[in-house]
Amino acid sequence: MQLPRVTLRQMTWTTSAIVLLGITLLLWSAFRHQESTLAIRAINQGTTMPDGFSVWHHLDANGIRFKSITPKNDTLLITFDSSAQSAAAKVVLDRTFPHGYIIAQQDEDNQASQWLSLLRDTSHRFG
């Protein structure tokens, strides 16, 4: 029994196909992971933060799903699977909470955005 001989052309096509498949999978996983975060902060220092249960109640009543609600420093962070869910939650929470709160979307979870914002913030130090 003889094994077929692999030519250089076949090896090149096979290697190219494997590399292309790998790049496609890498790009797909990067685009698929698009978490979005809402941050709720009080404008005035004396204003108390809303508790996570009330936020959960309002989002659940409007059919908006979220991944987590986490207090961090003086901010309440709400993580969503997509920017669309985050935008819908922002509309609901803007209606729900009084004007003493800032509700802002934070979609800069990837490292490229963090590096760009770091470079933008520190550009005045050069020269």
Swiss-Prot record:
This is Modulator protein MzrA. HAMAP family: Modulator_MzrA. Keywords: Cell inner membrane, Cell membrane, Membrane, Transmembrane, Transmembrane helix. Residues 33-127 are periplasmic. The chain crosses the membrane at residues 10-32. Its main location: membrane. Interacts with EnvZ. The keyword Transcription regulation does not apply. Belongs to the MzrA family. Modulates the activity of the EnvZ/OmpR two-component regulatory system, probably by directly modulating EnvZ enzymatic activity and increasing stability of phosphorylated OmpR. GO terms for molecular function: protein kinase binding. InterPro entries: Modulator_MzrA, SecD-TM. The keyword Transmembrane helix applies. GO terms for cellular component: plasma membrane. Residues 1-9 are cytoplasmic. It comes from the Bacteria. It is found in: Cell inner membrane. It is a single-pass membrane protein.
